[in-house]
UniProtKB/Swiss-Prot annotation:
Organism taxonomic ancestry: Bacteria, Bacillati, Actinomycetota, Actinomycetes, Mycobacteriales
Nucleotide-binding among keywords: yes
Function: Major role in the synthesis of nucleoside triphosphates other than ATP. The ATP gamma phosphate is transferred to the NDP beta phosphate via a ping-pong mechanism, using a phosphorylated active-site intermediate.
UniProt source species: Mycolicibacterium vanbaalenii (strain DSM 7251 / JCM 13017 / BCRC 16820 / KCTC 9966 / NRRL B-24157 / PYR-1) (Mycobacterium vanbaalenii)
Name under which the protein is recorded: Nucleoside diphosphate kinase
Record-level GO BP terms: CTP biosynthetic process; GTP biosynthetic process; UTP biosynthetic process
NCBIfam families: PRK00668.1
Length: 136
C-alpha cells in the first residue's frame, strides 16, 4: 500500500546546502517525491505545524528557528513512507541518538538543528500535508 508523508528540510539543511544530498538519500530509499517547494515559513504556518508543542519551554525557539530561513517542503510517497523516512532520518538528537548512515547521524550537528522533519503517523501526515500543500 502506498503511503504519503510530509518531509521538511529545515533552515539549517537549506543553509548548509544539503538539499541535494537529502533528496538523493530519499530517492535511494525508494521513496517518490510527489511534490516539492521551497517556502518561507510565516508565523501562522509555524504555529499551526508545531501546535502540539505550544506551551512547552522550547516552543518560542522552535518557531524562531523554523521561520529563520527557507524550508524545503516535500510530499513523499511509497510503501510505508512514514516509517521509511523516519528510519532514514535517524534519531532526533544527531550527536547522541542518530545512527551513522542516517541523515541526522551523518549530517546533523545538534538537536534543534537536526536538518529534517518527517510526519510521525498517518493522521499527522494528512494534517501536515494539508497545512503545507493545501488541497493536495
Amino acid at each position: 500500500m502506498t503511503e504519503r508523508t510530509l518531509v521538511l528540510i529545515k533552515p539549517d539543511g537549506v543553509q548548509r546546502r544539503l538539499i541535494g544530498e537529502i533528496i538523493s538519500r530519499i530517492e535511494a530509499k525508494g521513496l517518490t517525491v510527489a511534490a516539492l517547494e521551497l517556502k518561507n515559513v510565516d508565523d501562522a504556518l509555524a504555529r499551526a505545524h508545531y501546535a502540539e508543542h505550544e506551551g512547552k519551554p522550547f516552543f518560542a525557539s522552535l518557531l524562531e528557528f523554523i521561520t529563520s530561513g527557507p524550508v524545503v517542503a516535500a510530499i513523499l510517497e511509497g510503501p510505508r513512507a512514514i516509517a521509511a523516512f523516519r528510519q532514514l532520518a535517524g534519531g532526533t538528537d544527531p550527536v547522541e541518538k542518530a545512527t551513522p548512515g542516517t541523515i541526522r547521524g551523518d549530517l546533523g550537528l545538534e538537536t534543534q538543528f537536526n536538518l529534517v522533519h518527517g510526519s510521525d503517523s498517518p493522521d499527522s501526515a494528512a494534517r501536515e500535508i494539508e497545512l503545507w500543500f493545501p488541497g493536495r
